[in-house]
Design a protein with these regions (language model features):
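Acidic, Mg2+-coordinating phosphoryl-transfer loop and its flanking beta/alpha structural elements
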Residues: 133, 144-178
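A metal-dependent, Asp-based hydrolase signature
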Residues: 20-60, 70, 78
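Substrate-recognition/cap helix-loop segment adjacent to the acidic, metal-dependent catalytic center
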Residues: 6-8, 12, 32-41, 65, ...
Length: 178
């Protein structure tokens, strides 16, 4: 994001500021990154320029600093060892999500890794999660979605799955409590 902003002459955001903007997809991230510069009324041409820049850079830079949260690898291996099916559902583009997950968690036997594509609307719409649930031959109430954002929580509620929201991800505790 900062590469796209900097290339267009906008100030960069701190990692903490970006963390608060993440979770609703690239378009919303780019829009949120500009709102402070335009009193909330972001011109379409500014948004489109930043979004184009972000989409051009992200496939080449996602590896920088992308690591699993502490304890995640062990937790996932434990769940897989107990026979629980595991999947990943992200609003990141599918073409980035699959290599990202395979890069940072290569030893985890995910049954499904799904990023955003035109096939389904973005989270919090339930369609993509329900597709995963069906592919596992399960009913929504038999599946638990673990998420780190309000969007994840809303996706689980909309799909009728169980939910665990964790505080170690992108969203602050106060945002999750809301």
């Amino acid at each position: 994001l900062n590469l796209a902003l900097k290339a267009l002459g906008y100030p960069e955001h701190s990692v903490d500021a970006i963390r608060e903007m993440v979770g609703k997809g690239a378009r919303e991230l780019c829009l949120a990154s500009l709102k402070g510069y335009f009193n909330g009324n972001v011109p379409e041409e500014a948004f489109e320029a930043v979004h184009r820049g972000f989409m051009r850079e992200y496939p080449h830079t996602w590896q920088e600093g992308t690591v699993p949260y502490p304890g995640i690898r062990e937790m996932l291996l434990s769940l897989a060892g107990e026979g629980h099916p595991l999947g990943v559902l992200s609003n990141k583009p599918h073409a980035v999500t699959v290599p990202l997950v395979r890069h940072i968690l290569p030893e985890i036997p995910f049954r499904e890794v799904m990023g955003f594509s035109e096939r389904f609307p973005r989270k919090p719409e339930p369609d993509s999660l329900l597709s995963i649930v069906r592919s596992w031959g399960r009913e929504p109430a038999q599946v638990c979605m673990v998420g780190d954002s309000a969007h994840d929580g809303n996706t689980a509620v909309n799909a009728g799955t169980r939910l665990i929201l964790v505080g170690w991800g992108y969203s602050s505790r106060s945002a999750l409590d809301a």
